[in-house]
Regions:
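Rhodanese-like catalytic fold shared by cysteine-dependent sulfurtransferases
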Residues: 2-4, 17-41, 50-82, 88-123
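Sec-dependent N-terminal signal peptides
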Residues: 4-14
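Structural scaffold elements adjacent to functional motifs in cytosolic proteins
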Residues: 43-45
Length: 123
């Protein structure tokens, strides 16, 4: 009986570890290609407003993932239009991507954040 429980536990652990994260995490080149090719895309910078004002991707809107109203603000996004999300280094955008996916959005996340971005920056 113990052996059966051990085997079932091992299988469950393997299955849970192999589940997908629910969004695409891509490097800066792929992220640039995605936002350039898309007919419509919502680019969301999840850094603080001060960080956003220092420079952001062209066309990006700012919704601070650590803001108290983040969940309310993302409701304003169109669920029919893909979301491209980024932050400074990739940690906050991964948190935001999880929340967006759980809310029903299709999400691509910039792995490495804006510090990995080689394209145009808007101020």
């Amino acid at each position: 009986m113990k052996r059966v429980i051990y085997i079932i536990t091992a299988i469950l652990m393997l299955v849970s570890c192999s589940q997908k994260i629910g969004y695409n995490s891509v490097d800066a080149n792929k992220f640039a290609a995605i936002i350039q090719k898309a007919n419509k895309i919502q680019i969301v910078d999840v850094r603080t407003p001060d960080e956003f004002n220092e420079g952001h991707l062209p066309g990006a809107i700012n919704i601070d993932v650590n803001g108290t109203d983040f969940a309310e603000q993302i409701k304003k996004l169109d669920k029919k239009v893909p979301v491209a999300v980024y932050c400074r280094s990739g940690r906050r955008s991964k948190l935001a991507a999880d929340q967006l996916v759980n809310s029903g959005y299709t999400v691509t996340e910039l792995d490495g954040g804006i510090i990995s971005w080689q394209g145009e920056i808007e101020k």
